[in-house]
């Protein structure tokens, strides 16, 4: 195998053509800075101290490279990373077209693995990672709650309202209102005080002691509570379903006590004796009266 250890001829041609451009004693080379590559030149200054200058002359840069030389590099398969001078024709075939390079290096594409291109690709790879995209959750959090929708059917609305009312009633504590039972309270007061006049009831309320009032009020309230409990129990019993046969409920009669035959015989004898003695008494009384009458 023939191994080509000599440097490529394209590099020699580059150095030959670049020598007539650089009139001064200058060493030029390309340095890739982020975000854009620039040509940095070291010029000899006073006391032979090198001075770094940047030369972005497009004409000088274009004369260094031609279309034939770039094609020659592609034929020799020289990698882009090893070549110190990027070809000028690669601007038209730039893989990254969305990124605009600097105006001084308009024909030079940016590095595909540079920090700006990598950041742009990472930012716009997905919309979730893009900070400019507003997420739906944030919109829902900012949007006010939607007003209640109108009911499609009146039955559903009424059922919903009744269920809400029932829940409220179940959660609230019911306090009995005795103002609705004034008539019953007055009737109880009339029964206790044995009167039918409101004036006497008012007089008793004015002159009665606090203990008497408390006792009477407790008695009235207890009686009214018992009445309410009885009515509630009756309503519950009436709401219970009747038996499936449809027969009316039979009222149970009190149990009859059967007496033995000896006791029945004795009771019959006693009744006969009482019936026999009554007429004798009457007759004796009548005979006595008859006896007394002639004496008078």
From Swiss-Prot:
Ranges of Basic and acidic residues composition bias in the record: 112-121
Annotated Low complexity bias: 245-260
The protein's name in its UniProt record: Uncharacterized protein C4orf17 homolog
Domain of life: Eukaryota
Ranges annotated as biased composition (Polar residues): 153-162
Stretches for region Disordered: 89-121, 138-162, 232-296
InterPro entries, alphabetized: TBATA-like (IPR037394)
